[in-house]
Every structure is written in C-alpha cells, then in structure tokens.
C-alpha cells in the first residue's frame, strides 16, 4: 500500500468518526425540547432522529459541494491537510460535549480545515469570500432569525390558546411536538451529514479518485456518512440535550413545538441554498426565542451569553488545533507522521471520555432541575446532577410507655413503690 492510499484510508475513517461525534453532539438540536417538555421519553427521543437523520442525508448534496469547493482551493489540498482539519473538528466537538456546551460542529470542522490550510499553504489557500458569505454571515443571520421566529411563534401560540385549559393545550402540543421534532431531525440530516460528505469528497479529489469538476459525491460516501451520523445520534448527546432543554429556559409543550418548527424552517431553507449553517446555533436561537415569546418565562441570559462566547471562539480554536496537527504530521512525515497523528487523536478522545464518566449524564437524569452555570455537568464531580427519587422518610420516633414521665432537668425522680 502506498503512502497516499494509506493517508486516504485514515482520512475516510477520521471523517466518519467526526460524523459520528456530530451525530451525538447535535442530537439535542432536535430532541432537547421534546425531552424537556415530556413529549417523548428520552430513549425514544434519540431513536427517532437517528432514523430521520439517515433519511435526510440522502435528500440534498448542496452543502457537500460548498465544503468541497467553496471554502478552500481544491487544487492546493493534500490528504495531510484534510486529516488535520478533521482532527481540529473532532477535538473541539468532544471538548464542548464534555462541558455540555451546544457549540457548532459545522464551524469546528470548517475552522479545523481553514486552520490546517493556512498552516500548509498560507492565507492564499482560503477562499475568504466563501467563508464570509457561506459560513459567517449565514451563522449570524440564522441564529437571529431563529430567535425572532421562535419568539413570534411562541407568542402567537399562547395568544391563540388563551382561555383554553392548560392541561388540554399541553396534551395537544405534546403530540404536535413529535411531528415538529421529526422535521428538525430530517432537516439536520439534510445539512450536517453533507459536511462530512464534502470532506471525503475533497480527499478523493486530492487523491485523484474523482474529478475536481464533479459536483456530487459518490454513492458510497453518501451512505457511509448517513449511517455514521445515525449511529452517533442514537447514542444521544445527553450533556448537550440537558443544557438546551433545561439550561436556557424551562420548556413547556407549546414553546417546544414553536421552537422546533422555527428550527426546521430555517435549517431547511439554508440547506436548499447550500449554506453551511450551524444547526446548533439555530436550535439554540429558537429555544431562546421560545423563552422570550412566552409571557413570564425566565430566560437564563448568563448561560446564553457564555454560549455565544463559545461560538465566537470555535472557528479560531478549532483552527489552531488543525494547524498544530498539520505541522506535527507534516514535520514528521510519511507513515510515522500519519500514524502518530491518528494515535494522538484517539488518545485525546479516550481521555475526554474517561473524564466524562466522573459526572455521568444520561436518560435517567437529563431532566433534573438545572443548578449551576453552563458547565454544571462537569462541575458536578462524581455525584449525579439530581436524584429524581422521593426522599426516604425518617423512621417514626418510639412511643413512650404508659404512665411514663420524661425526666426534667434539676428534678430527681423516684421509682414508684
């Protein structure tokens, strides 16, 4: 096996690993509000988007073309560069998952690839007009638009159901949430699975397996990416589901349906035009909007503000990881460089997973009362976030025997004759 084929295999495996992390990192985008409102049981709520993400991945390839051709010069791409970019995306995904921060997998991937490109060939390798028009501007506009649509939708829902018994409306909206959450999952598949397809497409172009003029990835790329994302989604990113469902605002079924419908509309629109949108930012914006639109709702703006900071540093920090990885792999070179880079990635992933086991979050405590700040899950240490079981009552005090008089301080008592 020659070195280039070896590198191609490593890139494909790493790309599918990124797609897997993207699946469990972004499960919360579709199902956090349904779980928080009680519309779906947690286990069912992660199985449904797994199937719909699989289907959605086959519905569009416009975003894949953007990743493959619209952000960096395909003629300057090497397999080392693509691998380093993927490492940047995976490491950032895992770190933010550990902290429970719903950051953008899309921007982590793009940041990693752009950083590796700059390290490899300099600024000239990046198509900056594409980065601005296809990534940065849509991210800002989509998050604000989702917040606005979510707020207006929630306000309209509560306005039109005013006077109807709350128990009756919540029962109806819980059923409606199954449909709206399914639509978000389908939309997520049409957008996020495409990004990994685009990366593998880019690697195949670099290797010479497909023409640089091709506009659609090979079928095996589409199928493998769809399956990897579906598998990751089924695992459920419980840490991020908890933050989205409980950390920003307490979600009721009407809010949940409005937020999910807003997310689906914005994501599907962006996928149609080929924008590499962050579905996480759209979902977060919709949840915030549902809190703003509900009269009397409490929005945790401190948590939201820290999320925005995480979004702002995603591109540059993932880019730094990508640039460092490229420098390391390229400096060592050959088979040793590729093997070392691959081994370091898996060692890092294992260390993060082991750290997460100190404060496990799963379907049993994902809906526990929110306490602390944005990284409450990590700070909980070895203790669970909350115990949902009712407290065990204390045993009753013993009943004194008949004719018993409790002794009093300073008074001597004598036994009866």
From Swiss-Prot:
Any Gene Ontology CC annotation: plasma membrane
- Establish whether keyword Oxidoreductase is in the entry: no
Annotated keywords: Cell membrane, Membrane, Phosphate transport, Symport, Transmembrane, Transmembrane helix, Transport
Q: Per UniProt, what is one GO molecular function of this protein?
A: symporter activity
Ranges for the region named Disordered are: 379-417
Q: Where are the transmembrane segments?
A: 5-25, 44-64, 81-101, 108-128, 135-155, 218-238, 327-347
| Pfam families cross-referenced by the UniProt entry | PHO4
Which reactions appear under catalytic activity for this entry?
Answer: phosphate(in) + H(+)(in) = phosphate(out) + H(+)(out)
Instruction: Indicate where this protein resides in the cell.
Output: Cell membrane
Biological process, per Gene Ontology: phosphate ion transmembrane transport
Q: Spans of biased composition, class Pro residues? A: 390-404
What kind of membrane protein is this, topologically?
A: Multi-pass membrane protein
Tell me the InterPro entries matching this sequence. Answer: Phos_transporter
Superkingdom of the source species: Bacteria
| Family of this protein | Belongs to the inorganic phosphate transporter (PiT) (TC 2.A.20) family. Pit subfamily.
Instruction: Cite any additional comment in the entry.
Output: Was identified as a high-confidence drug target.
Question: What function does this protein fulfil?
Answer: Low-affinity inorganic phosphate transporter.
Name of the protein in question:
Probable low-affinity inorganic phosphate transporter
Q: What is the lineage of its organism?
A: Bacteria, Bacillati, Actinomycetota, Actinomycetes, Mycobacteriales
Name of encoding gene:
pit
